[in-house]
Amino acid sequence: MSSNGPRDEVFTTVLVNERGEVADWDAHRQRLEDHAGRLRIALPDEAPVLNVPLSSTWTLARISCAKNGAAWTIEQRTVGFRDEAIDAITHPAPRWNERTNGCKHGAWSPYNEARKAAEEAGCDAALLVHEHCIVDGDRATPMVLDEDGTVWMASVEEGGVAGITASVLERQLPRLGFPVVKGKLNERTVARCEEFILVGTGMGVCRVDSLDGELLGQTTVLSQRCQELLHEHFTEKATWSLPG
């Protein structure tokens, strides 16, 4: 795994089922191609080949390509906590330039350091802040339910990564009566929210019970509905495929 400059590597993290199939591979591949283009990294022509897990549980696979690499690098690991209530801290968001912000790239250590800071504070995740607004999570996408029933997400222009899981929910929530709006997740929006969740490939849908020691929200309706939507999504055969 590269730990140098952003243009040394591009990667994505996928969910793998017990048959070795990947969830939402087309979306992951499209994002890889987009990020690789922005980082000027040439991807291999052949598809990555994943090992079939040795258990009946889902796993995660980090699929990466180095700047000068001719092949994919794949690191598989178990899923940690998923679909749980968690506690979070705020942490300064890493910044590069407009072309690089929002890419999953080789200079990923600031995200890992944010996660470590959360763990050292006895928490589960870090919410990344730039100019007094939450722009991303250390490994998941923030979504906020306001008092009017609108779900707010930070726009990609704020510098966060466009999450694959978040995009699935963004498409499905309006049919359940939850309009989704892109905007700034400022202190007032977060403090007055009905519920704050983090969604991601590994975390699933986690309700953020507290942020920097302050309790958040009064309801669990958003987390429950999102968990139900993802359950439906992952039971659909079309969601899963072998990379190719």
Question: What are the roles of these predicted feature ranges?
Answer:
Residues 133-156:
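Glycine- and Gly-Pro-enriched alpha-helical subdomains that act as flexible
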Residues 164:
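Active-site microenvironment for binding and transforming phosphate-containing groups
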Residues 24, 134, 160-161:
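Short, contiguous, pocket-lining structural segments
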Residues 155-159, 183-185:
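Short, glycine/charged-rich beta-strand-loop motifs at protein surfaces that mediate ligand recognition
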Residues 1-126, 130-131, 170-244:
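Conserved alpha/beta cores of soluble small-molecule-handling proteins
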Residues 29, 141, 157-158, 222:
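A generic structural motif
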